[in-house]
Amino acid sequence: MNFSALKHVRSEKDPYTLMRLIDANIINTYKTLMLAKKTNVKKYFSVSTDKAASPINLMGASKRVMEMILGEFSNHINTSSARFGNVAFSNGSLLHGMVNRFYNKQPFVAPKDVMRYFLTSTEAAKLSILSTFSGKNGELFIPKIELKKIEKSFPEIAKNFLKYNGYEMHICTSEDEARNNIEALLKKKKWPCYLFDTDTDGEKLEEIFIGNEEKTIKNKFDSLQIIDIKNLTNL
């Protein structure tokens, strides 16, 4: 099972992390597949991401290429994969950042126009294990959910998080304002938040799990959709 990945769009911020992204998502997958083929491994699983569906950034494109490599190797070894979105409280996630800022008494800073769906680590693990042991050769598992019903905006997530911890969200017009007023606001049980229009190139405003030209195949699972990665031929 291959869980090595750089899955954040911010990984594209400079040439060095970009090279590491390509190495982790593409080259290492190819190398371990070659090793698996050489040693007659019975099954190879590699985790993907929702950003591989109709990718608009290099990170998503790298995972799309990884899926295509899996499809190519399915002629020699039994392969499968799974796409899912953000794992709640995982390193680099919004919730992980919120927890760190909360305990360090720092303002919340987040885009206001981005919608996200979170899985628990248990849900992500179950999906990966299910794909590994129940997925047929070349199958890509995807959660079958209505994203528009369960996606949350970052302001909504921040509001709920603060309410749970006994604070009220206080909107500031700049990050400097939020930093300068944090002590006074905390005494009133209010938490300074600066919300802005997303400025990260290649960041999808809403998540999708299935690309425009991708088609699902029939399967026995009520809560899953499956794509045959052997049919993936382009980015």
Sequence positions of predicted segments:
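Conserved Rossmann-fold NAD(P)-dependent oxidoreductase catalytic core, especially the SDR/UDP-sugar
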Residues: 2, 9-11, 15-67, 72
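Strand-loop microenvironment adjacent to phosphate/nucleotide-handling motifs in alpha/beta enzyme folds
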Residues: 70-94, 99-235
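Short connector loops/turns at beta-strand edges and beta->alpha or beta->beta junctions
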Residues: 6-9, 103-104
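Functionally constrained cores in energy, signaling, and assembly domains
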Residues: 3-4, 12, 24, 30-32, ...
